[in-house]
Design a protein with these regions (language model features):
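Beta-sandwich/jelly-roll carbohydrate-recognition scaffolds of carbohydrate-active enzymes
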Residues: 1-179
């Protein structure tokens, strides 16, 4: 484990994955190095858990797959603010090959959406207790970079933050600036 201002690194021993993190003011940058012979590279987006978890904290979550390298969305929580919206935009350094989700809460009614398989490759994911996953082709590279921008205003604000603070730069360049 390595930790210094603007940089954190840890080996995820259970998976053999090296995780490196750095940041700008509004963007978190992740770099994952998978074992050379990995058959799968997966990122989990857990929209349920956070600091100070309790049942009823998450009011709603939405995840939208915009294209094969961009995911946007938001989470509405109840707590220190009645309806606090946190918007995000995530970009990936290589294309998503497959994605899906699991709804951890009971869904009583899905209306017209019932005719769709909303658990796999459905581009608009919504629910109270959502955990999504994104798979990537390990043959392209052992490394995957993920940039996650936040905004308290809108998804468009998160996209603007992503473009303004992390566009055109890779993990190493952004880590050097953060130090």
């Amino acid at each position: 484990e390595i930790s210094r201002p603007g940089y954190y690194e840890v080996m995820l021993a259970d998976y053999g994955v090296k995780a490196q993190l750095t940041t700008t003011q509004r963007v978190g940058i992740h770099k994952y190095t998978y074992p050379t012979n990995s058959e799968n590279q997966r990122i989990i987006l857990d929209m349920i858990h956070g600091i100070y978890n309790y049942d009823g904290k998450v009011l709603w979550t939405n995840i939208r797959v915009e294209n094969d390298t961009l995911v946007t969305g938001y989470r509405i929580t109840n707590g220190w603010a009645r309806t606090n919206y946190t918007y995000f935009a995530m970009s990936f350094s290589k294309p998503i090959t497959h994605y899906g989700c699991e709804e951890k809460a009971k869904v009583n009614y899905r209306g017209g959406y019932a005719k769709f398989n909303m658990k796999e490759n459905f581009p608009d994911i919504g629910g109270r207790k959502i955990v999504a996953y994104f798979d990537f082709d390990p043959k392209m590279s052992d490394e995957l970079e993920v940039k996650v921008a936040l905004s308290g205003v809108s998804t468009e604000g998160a996209l603007k933050n992503l473009r303004a603070e992390a566009s055109g730069a890779d993990f190493d360049q952004l880590a050097a600036k953060a130090s």
